[in-house]
Amino acid sequence: MRKVTIVFHDAGGGHRNAAEALKTVLEEQDYPWQVKLLNLQELLAPIDFAAKATGLRFQDGYNLLLRKGWTRITPQLLVLLRYTIRLHHGRIVRLLQKHWSEHSTHLVLSVIPHFNRCLAESIRKEMPGAAFVTLLTDLADYPPGFWMVRESEYIVCGSELAKQQALSMGHPRRRIFETSGMVLKPSFYRKPEIDRRQERLRLGLRPDLPTGIVMFGGHGSAAMLEIAKRVDRSPNRLQLIFLCGHNAALAEKLRALHMTKPSRIEGFTSEVPYFMSLADFFIGKPGPGSISEALQFGLPVIVEQNSRTMPQERYNGKWVTEKRVGLVVPDFSGIEPVLGQMLKPSTFEELRRNVVHYKNHAIYEVPSILDHVMTSKAMESWQTSSTWNSVDPFAGAAWAGLT
């Protein structure tokens, strides 16, 4: 049985979501693969510089920035993070090598940025026969060294720009794979069969009003308060569903506003697809996951693009504009006129039409890509072997689909 290890961390929710979604689908497919998840942050806990300096783990500090909306300082923090990773590169590689020596695998799939040079070197040193795949969970890279590095072996990207970035770095075309979008949980492909009218009524909403869903990832954002206040005093006829994630304090502050417009405020929920099925449009952060989830449910989006936008997400607003699947606002303090524009029948119909035409099946495209990679890696190992007998190129015939 072939072993696949998916490397993730919990800085932001998107990396874990991608890892768990891929594990679920890979195990459902007809491949004899054993799939394991590796939380890199736990493995690197002995050298977590942030925890040693502040008592706060790196991933917790990052998530705190998201909750507080302190994202304006992320470019400076990225410089510090890159420097720290370079400083500890040798120790990180050794910890990874130790892990691989105890938990060997045939393919390593990274769904995280920053650490891919360390991962590539540790695999080359400890498991030279293993394949190393980097799957971007962003629509584009933020060079240098964010997602793609010279040492990257195989790259899976979800946009034409990311593919061109990989090619411009000199990566061979045969090792670059473009999917139709971002990896989403399988649940986003199984839309709930519900009576929207009855469900809206049950949640205290009106069945006849345009309904927006407001989301800022798994930890919410203070920007949701600004949106609630602005929308509540706007002349636009609509209602909102707020999903606050793990930010219970934010949910309480929203409830304390006592909005005059109908609203529903939820804390953390695993029923995001259910709430999206009740909505007509999306308002939130320009994260690749949030945008892609909304589009999967046919929702045009309104996202913010300014100096507070995290560097790796700055292309996303441009992507939304180019695809004509939503509107971009410079600041949510100006959301009222943008909402008015979106709710014009002609504008909404055009955006909705473009959203419906956008098809993303990335989660179901990745298994065949990985199967191809493992087949290619096995053949390369055979071709570069010093003797014909050192590697059996057909040892994996069953998993490779060879006959």
Q: What role is predicted for each listed range?
A:
Residues 153-211, 216-217:
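A nucleotide-sugar donor-handling region in carbohydrate enzymes
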Residues 321-324, 330-347:
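C-terminal "capping" alpha-helix adjacent to the active site of nucleotide-linked donor transferases
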Residues 194-201, 205-278:
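Donor-nucleotide binding loops and adjacent catalytic segments primarily
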Residues 282-284, 300-310:
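Short hydrophobic beta-strand element within catalytic cores of glycosyltransferases
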Residues 277-290:
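Acidic donor-binding loop of glycosyltransferase active sites
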Residues 346-403:
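C-terminal amphipathic helix plus adjacent low-complexity
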Residues 18, 68-171, 175-178:
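Active-site and donor-binding regions of nucleotide-sugar-utilizing enzymes
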Residues 21, 25-103:
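Conserved N-terminal ligand/cofactor-binding loop architecture of enzyme catalytic domains
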